[in-house]
Amino acid sequence: MPNKPPQKSSRNEIFPHFSSHNQFFTLTLQPNKNKTMKNIFKIKKEERILALVSMLVFASLNAVLIHSYPASFFKAGKLGFWSIFYKHFTVSGFDAYSYIFLSNEKIYFELSRHPLFGALLYPGACLNDWLMGWTHHNCATFIMAVMLVISATFSAVFFFRICRELIQLCRLDAYILTAFFFSFASIMLTTMVPDHFCFSMLCLLVSIYMVGTCMAQGKQLKAWQASLLFLTTAGVSLSNGVKTGIMSLFCNGRKVFSPRFFAIAFILPLLIMGGSFYYQNEYIVKPQQEKGKEIERKLMPKRPDIAQKNAVHDAWMDAHRGKSVSDMPFLKWTDVSTPRMESIVENLFGEGIQLHQKELLKDLSVSRPTFIRYDWAISYLFEAFVFLLFAAGVFYSRHSRLMWMCLSCAAFDAFLHLVLGFGLNEVYIMAAHWMFVIPFTMGYAFREAQPKLANAMRGVTLFLAIYFWAYNATLIITHFL
């Protein structure tokens, strides 16, 4: 039967319950001795159709984006790839720095926040260098598209697997929630834009699956497993490393702070990332910056129009950038002045889920206003439905240790964006770091609510998934075609 959930023995073997101490961190999951974790990247039989459909959908989205690119994106040789990509790529607030790295191995992304992103892209850069010599065309866009499709497809597989194995949903519910999650505008864009978010999303979903499986089996996360998860997750996006620490704490408790575990799981990866940062900064970034300053010194006297354009851009950014706590590193990205409630309505739960028709896919650093209102009042109604479904999911998952872990990770994102204001003006592009929590909690509502209420929530979720796919995909495809 297609809707039959995975075999389970009893509620106490799978589902969390309060221990006798009745404390927050003593929520327990009883072990399921029959399950082991082997070759987690092997696609299982029931996941094959999902993987195939996902791959085709994500490949199509990437093809649409590549089709929209100008001919200059495919030129090879000793060219100014910064000017080619940075000045002509505008998709919301996403960056095209990976295209530049794949073309000439120059680093323009913030190295301190993405210390191993260059290492992830390096094989692609080597491949592109060989292909450019062979084809005389820059294949960076195609290489990045392949990487994104693979990452997005496995993200869909792990999302589905978490729904099936850890939340214990039937296949139909897992399909509905997977379609619902990837119908979100920000997630759909994440699977096709040349930024780090799609890779970060995969790292986080793999981490949730591995740690959740350990908890379900009554096992502890091994130090080398935590080390690998922390290295990959924090290496792609440093702040996400905190979530690996949160997950390790939920799984292993205070043993996380034992000298041996802490050294292997966190200190060793930090040393590796620190060494990688130092090498790239000293031998790639600094020489690159010095060369750029030299070119600027020679060019500026001859091109006063460049200084004028830079002044206009700086004035725009000053007018639309919130006031930071300090100009010190990391603190310079904070924001204490942008209204929080409007950010939640229009950007966090707004643009993150449904694109605004006005100023479609424009970049805040170029021309997009901080806040845009929807053309249709019904868009706010659908946003309210998503929020209510999320709230219901939080209620029904309140006894789940797995969901408390995921919600704690999402709370860290809320602290970063809503309290500190990190990236608040473009908070919608960070949705891949946390928004999977919404459908995960909804899965518990499907499972635990009374049948009539559960069926009503399924129906609303299915309708929203179909609507968001039609609405967001139509806007994206027509925009790029």
Which role fits each region the language model picked out?
Residues 93-142, 310-394, 403-406:
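Lumenal/periplasmic acceptor-binding loop at the mouth of the active site in multi-pass
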Residues 221-252, 266-269, 463-464:
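Membrane-interface alpha helices of multi-pass inner-membrane proteins
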Residues 199-216, 437, 441:
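Specific aromatic-rich, kink-prone transmembrane helix
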Residues 44-92, 101-105, 268-284, 464-471:
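Transmembrane signal-anchor helices characteristic of membrane glycosylation enzymes that use polyprenol
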Residues 192-196:
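Short acidic/glycine- and proline-prone juxtamembrane loop motifs at membrane-interface regions
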Residues 37-41, 241-271, 286-298:
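Perimembrane helix-loop-helix junctions
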Residues 159-183, 404:
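Transmembrane-helix signature of polytopic, membrane-embedded enzymes
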Residues 4, 146-167, 389-392:
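Transmembrane-helix motifs of polytopic, lipid-linked glycan transferases
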